[in-house]
């Protein structure tokens, strides 16, 4: 009996999730509504490409958005068709990987939030953990080592087709409006699969602090370690550097502070028993600072065909006439 990597039903469920999340068009300029107008055909094309090993993702569309602090963040947006496939794979691997994640991890996880992370910090303070290492990993999403990440994925995911897809997405092409480049390191922010891969990569850090007996709270690449003395904080600091060195990462900022002096984490100010939320801390819609001009998709597909690469999909827009 033939088994399929992803059944049509799985792709249907994935599309509904993509549709609920809204989102803009990718490099092919196909919107969610345009994809849906050829729904059956588009999903069937994806189904065939995936199960005949012809699927190839389109380049990611690199845009720049305002972080709200005067800096810009690059987001790499997959085409709708690729978001569907990534979401379908995510729905397969998420239950497997979520079982492995630690309780100290709050970012990008269903049923977990910034509010819960803040509450956890308060609980540790009330238990006497008043010294804090406040750390932020330098350019985490840009510096993730693909070889190390794939090794970690293989510890839990054994399906070679799924592993192959994840590797394809990690080594994605990126269109920035001028050239197409290939991602050599890092996890592209903006892809459905990226958050769970980020948590998997940093799970080793979570485990190390859990085993040390420290109180540890991590939200994505931003974490704090809570200790009962400055001496304990120094030991935790050393462990932090050792683990990040193994992961080929470095800290951007790192401070040992106390609740008496106060510190800021996840946009919240902690001072002694007080938790202060700045007045202007509101969820703002991220302003797009740069949106690249369209990529010539016909020329791109011709180049792909000439190189022997197939599976970039048929046109997803409604046919005229």
Regions found by a protein language model. Name each.
Residues 86-106:
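Electropositive, glycine- and tryptophan-enriched low-complexity nucleic-acid-binding patches
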Residues 38-41, 45-48:
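Intein modules and their embedded homing endonuclease domains
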Residues 73-79:
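Conserved phosphate-binding loops in nucleotide/dinucleotide-binding enzymes
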Residues 1-40:
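Non-catalytic, polymerase-adjacent accessory regions of viral genome-replication enzymes
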Residues 81, 85:
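Duplex nucleic acid-engaging cores and interfaces of nucleic-acid transaction enzymes
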Residues 46-64, 68, 100-104, 108-262:
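Conserved polymerase palm-domain catalytic core
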Residues 269-321:
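Active-site and adjacent loop segments of nucleotide-processing enzymes
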Residues 91, 135-137, 229, 268, ...:
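Residues immediately flanking
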């Amino acid at each position: 009996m033939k088994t399929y990597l992803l059944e049509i039903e799985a792709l249907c469920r994935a599309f509904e999730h993509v549709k609920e999340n809204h989102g803009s068009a990718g490099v092919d300029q196909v919107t969610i509504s345009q994809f849906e107008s050829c729904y059956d055909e588009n999903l069937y094309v994806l189904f065939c490409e995936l199960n005949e090993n012809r699927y190839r993702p389109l380049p990611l569309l690199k845009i720049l958005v305002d972080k709200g602090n005067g800096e810009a963040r690059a987001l790499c947006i997959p085409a709708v068709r690729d978001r569907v496939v990534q979401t379908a794979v995510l729905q397969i691997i998420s239950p497997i990987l979520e079982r492995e994640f630690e309780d100290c991890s709050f970012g990008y996880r269903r049923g977990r939030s910034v509010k819960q992370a803040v509450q956890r910090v308060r609980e540790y303070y009330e238990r006497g953990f008043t010294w804090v290492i406040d750390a932020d990993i330098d350019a985490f999403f840009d510096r993730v080592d693909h070889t190390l990440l794939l090794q970690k994925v293989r510890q839990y995911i054994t399906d070679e087709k799924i592993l192959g897809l994840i590797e394809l997405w990690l080594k994605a092409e990126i269109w920035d409006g001028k050239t197409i480049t290939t991602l050599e390191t890092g996890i592209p922010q903006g892809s459905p699969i990226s958050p769970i891969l980020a948590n998997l990569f940093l799970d080793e850090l979570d485990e190390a602090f859990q085993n040390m007996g420290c109180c540890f709270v991590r939200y994505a690449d931003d974490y704090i370690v809570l200790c009962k003395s400055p001496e304990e904080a120094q030991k935790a600091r050393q462990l932090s550097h050792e683990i990040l060195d193994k992961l080929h990462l470095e800290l951007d900022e790192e401070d040992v502070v106390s609740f008496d002096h106060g510190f800021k984490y996840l946009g919240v100010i902690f001072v002694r028993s007080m938790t202060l939320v700045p007045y202007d801390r509101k969820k703002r819609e991220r302003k797009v600072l740069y949106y690249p001009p369209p990529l010539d998709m016909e020329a791109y597909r011709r180049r792909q065909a000439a190189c022997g690469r197939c599976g970039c999909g048929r046109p997803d827009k409604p046919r005229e006439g």
